[in-house]
Amino acid sequence: MNTPQNSPLGQATAYLDQYDASLLFPIARATKRAEIGVTGALPFLGADMWTAFELSWLNLRGKPQVALARFTVPCESPNIIESKSFKLYLNSFNNTRFADVDAVKARLRADLSEAVWRDAGKNVSPDAAAPPSIGVTLLLPELFDREPIYELDGLSLDRLDVECTHYTPAPDLLRVVPDEAPVSEVLVSNLLKSNCPVTGQPDWASVQISYSGAPIDQEGLLQYLVSFRNHNEFHEQCVERIFMDLWTRCKPVRLAVYARYTRRGGLDINPFRTSYAQALPANVRNARQ
């Protein structure tokens, strides 16, 4: 089984410039999900939305082409893709010729779909429907000037002057305000930080929490988000941990957690988890991305 420790992270790596799908390194979601009590049917919906800022290939005449790429990986897929392997895979397009943009998109979709769904069919009937492919969108240079920058909407938790003493996840800080009427509100913070579980490099994020139910104590919520500061976990895993801690501790009627992480190696990852069916948020970067 692939683990973070035997991934390309933290290792000296040769950068290949000829297409090689074997560079992709999927890691099973199940191990970290078991830590937060998710072992059967998922209690959430959603996806991991990636943006690639460093994608290039050659056309059939050898002329370089560039694009921004957006990828949408369903959270029900059994695997995540380790980000350095994703970067190495994209770099392998650099000196590879493709007939057109559609050929690049098709290759990306096929390879990434195979990686995130790998091993999904081991115990599945041969008559079962094929798993969905991931979403792939390429944005060409003539549209670059239309790329917006938006901050996450919501009431800022960062306005609160709280004392912070916990720097590893402390779900006991989460609580609801007793004897208050139910609310529907959207809260945001720019203070989420965690670390890569292999290299220890910092991962910075803005997070948005939308919920309906008993009002969540905002000071405790901010302290809880700050408590991830020295925590070692991948982006997707942090967001699922936040979702499950809120879901089990505060018992909202509805809940959605969305984080936008700053880019590393030309890639950003923006996980979204929700307790109910809804459209994915627009994959629009914020100022720090």
Swiss-Prot record:
GO terms for cellular component: cytoplasm. It is found in: Cytoplasm. GO terms for molecular function: preQ1 synthase activity. Pathway: tRNA modification; tRNA-queuosine biosynthesis. One of its GO terms (biological process) is queuosine biosynthetic process. Substrate binds at residues 81-83, 235-236. Its EC number is 1.7.1.13. InterPro entries: GTP-CH-I_C/QueF, NADPH_dep_7-cyano-7-deazaG_red, QueF, QueF_N, QueF_type2. It catalyses: 7-aminomethyl-7-carbaguanine + 2 NADP(+) = 7-cyano-7-deazaguanine + 2 NADPH + 3 H(+). The active site is at 196 (thioimide intermediate), 203 (proton donor). It comes from the Bacteria. Keywords: Cytoplasm, NADP, Oxidoreductase, Queuosine biosynthesis. Pfam families: QueF, QueF_N. NADPH binds at residues 83-84, 264-265. Belongs to the GTP cyclohydrolase I family. QueF type 2 subfamily. Catalyzes the NADPH-dependent reduction of 7-cyano-7-deazaguanine (preQ0) to 7-aminomethyl-7-deazaguanine (preQ1). Homodimer. This is NADPH-dependent 7-cyano-7-deazaguanine reductase. It comes from Albidiferax ferrireducens (strain ATCC BAA-621 / DSM 15236 / T118). The gene is queF.
